[in-house]
Structure formats: structure tokens, C-alpha cells
Amino acid sequence: MPSPKRTFLDRELAHLVKHAYANAPAVKRIFDDAGVKPTEIKRVADLARVPVTPKDRLIQMQRESPPFGGFLAADPQRLKHIYLSPGPLFEPQGADRALDQVAAEIFRIAGFKRGEIALNTLSYHLSPGGWLLEGGLQRAGVCVVPGGVGNTELQVRTRSE
């Protein structure tokens, strides 16, 4: 019998696949070209049947159909951020902050405590790294000083004060 966590993951995955197929033209095209129906993806184990899109192909698709290559399965007006990661790849971020919760749990396990102050030196420039750390730290109750990269002497002085 599957664990409650596995049952939850399977159910969420099946929902996500059906949603992406119905709302993201590129996902529908990839599934159809491979002869895979979204209803066939019911469990995490079924992911092996999902066609993989290589990074080079994804970049090409984003150039042909900017900015997301037909992979956006949400209303563009509901996006919170658009990141540009190395590749270059455009990455949308909606209002869902599930990654913040995951990052917060990791920070708690690492020993961060509510009320502490953290200097975030990851870049906030176009990539999601700085924002992901900030969201997780804030969710864990930590106050964030958004340092980013550069200004090393000022950041060292800020840290020591």
C-alpha cells in the first residue's frame, strides 16, 4: 500500500499533467507527437513515459514562441516574476510560493531561527537564486538583508555591524 505522501504526490502529478496538457500548447504537442495521453500519467513512476525536451530544444522553442515557448500553462497576467536563467531560458514564476515553503524547511533544518537576520549574497539580477533564498528565509521568520553580488566591503561592514 502506498504511503500517504506517495498517494498525494501521485494525485498532484496527475492533476499537473492534465492541466499542462490542456493549457500549454507545447506540452500538448510533445505528448501528442509521442503518442502519450495525459490520462496515462497517474503515478510518479509513469514519468518515464513523458518525453524529455532537451535544453537546446527548449531554447529554440522559446525563441520561436517567446517568451516561454508554449510551455506557460497559466494566465500571464498572474505572473509575479519572469527570470532569465543561464541558457538563456525564460522562467515564469506565479503567485504560488510552494518553493518558499520547501526552502524554509531547509533553512529551519540548517538551524536558522525566527528573528535572526541573514545577509543574502546571492544575485537578485534576472535569476531566481536570490529571490528563492529570500522567500525561504522570510517564510522561516528570518529578516533578510538583500545584498546580492558586489559591494563586498559594504556587505562585510554590514555583516559585522
Where are these regions (language model features)?
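Conserved AMP-binding loop of ANL adenylate-forming enzymes
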Residues: 109-144
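Conserved adenylate-forming
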Residues: 15-16, 34, 131-161
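Positions that flank functional sites
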Residues: 46, 122, 151-153
